[in-house]
Amino acid sequence: MPMIPAAVLAAVALSLWAIPVGAAVNEKEKADLAPVVTAAKVTLEQGLLTSKQNGKPISAKFEIENGKPQLSIYTVKDGSKYFEVIVDHSSGAIAKTEPITGGDDLANAKKQNDGMFRATRELREAVKEAKRDNPGYNAVSVLSEIKDSHSLATVTLVKDNDWKTAVIDLTVYKPLIKE
């Protein structure tokens, strides 16, 4: 039986451990995120609005990064410049903006930007619609994708520890009740 070098095993284990943007959240991450989203003073919609200072939002999510909660939003400017905007989940101010220049982050940003190609509505509107259709739930993330020539937004929602996903068509205009 051939021996597999420890470095190869470590690399494989690390690659399986890393979670790309938009990947399914495991149960531990859900348990960690639910109270963060519930306690956040800034909603996903507010973060999306704030991030527009740095381009068009193409995805957003609450996450735990290095043990600390944050609201991360990917934006695109001038059609080809991608940024990660970190919005402080307590104050609503932009904490940091970094260009996305390579790797999986850039590939994901391009895919999400493609998902907005036929959109006639903003992601923020999709989040509002998903929350309206699911009273009492808070939005955890929103990701755009293109499917069957429609721009779709997948909105992940949580209420206590109950998780739901809503898929909203961004190519269909739907007037929303003002909140």
Question: Each PLM stretch: what is its role?
Answer:
Residues 2-8, 13-179:
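Long, terminal "pre-/pro-" and other extracytoplasmic accessory regions
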